[in-house]
Amino acid sequence: MMDPCSVGVQLRTTNECHKTYYTRHTGFKTLQELSSNDMLLLQLRTGMTLSGNNTICFHHAKVYIDRFEDLQKSCCDPFNIHKKLAKKNLHVIDLDDATFLSAKFGRQLVPGWKLCPKCTQIINGSVDVDSEDRQKRKPDSDGRTAKALRSLQFANPGKQTEFAPETGKREKRRLTKNATAGSDRQVIPAKSKVYDSQGLLIFSGMDLCDCLDEDCLGCFYACPACGSTKCGAECRCDRKWLYEQIEIEGGEIIHNKHAG
């Protein structure tokens, strides 16, 4: 059995090291093998303090560097305006945008996150970004932008490094959880656990986020019980029920394929 990588250890996601979801190969890279740009992206997307001697497994390299943008399925909602997930017509925040917008709004924005048209419109309306401003921030991505990003103090908010709105609101907007059992979750008999002690689905071993997106790296506040950002209103560890469906922006219903 291969040892976990430094990234998995620091993020407490050692159970995900060496998975073959996104690559058929297993192994390690030292961080000094990464380009300076990839190293910077990794630091910003994980919130970690890294050194060249640290290692990253091929799975975590895919998740946080190569496929990070593809895995962001919804608007990062920097202004806390969405009651449901916004997943349509998303715009990727690049390295230069992250520096510029983080400085302008004083909010943590990570390159690779995405904005919906509504949030983009708010940004364009709130900030006078004329052509001169854009030219000032675009050409120098290897110099001033990198220095500015390194100078920003980012706390690590978890696996997906989401901007954290006011306490409690993310869970309210991510899940529509009715008080009556069985309406949006499937209740399993009291003696039958659906999740194991690590929060994995017992029948498949899958680390499924409560938003029901199988590619999601975690979009909730860190669970007070286990620290995972994949637990919704209640910790998944040893849980005896799972969500049957959720409703996202636009009224679309996502059904849990594992609820049957």
From Swiss-Prot:
Q: Where in the cell is it found?
A: Cytoplasm
Pfam families assigned: ARF7EP_C
**Glycyl lysine isopeptide (Lys-Gly) (interchain with G-Cter in SUMO2) crosslink location in chain:** K177
For the modification Phosphoserine, the affected residues are S183
| TM annotation in the entry | none
GO CC terms in record: cytosol; focal adhesion; intracellular membrane-bounded organelle; nucleolus; nucleoplasm; plasma membrane
UniProt entry keywords in alphabetical sequence: Acetylation, Cytoplasm, Isopeptide bond, Phosphoprotein, Ubl conjugation
Q: What is its main location?
A: cytoplasm
Name residues in a coiled coil: none
Q: Any idea which residues bear N-acetylmethionine here?
A: M1
Subunit and interaction comment: Interacts with ARL14 and MYO1E.
The task this protein performs is described as:
Through its interaction with ARL14 and MYO1E, may connect MHC class II-containing cytoplasmic vesicles to the actin network and hence controls the movement of these vesicles along the actin cytoskeleton in dendritic cells.
Task: State what protein this is by name.
Answer: ARL14 effector protein
**Species this chain originates from:** Bos taurus
Q: Which gene encodes it?
A: ARL14EP
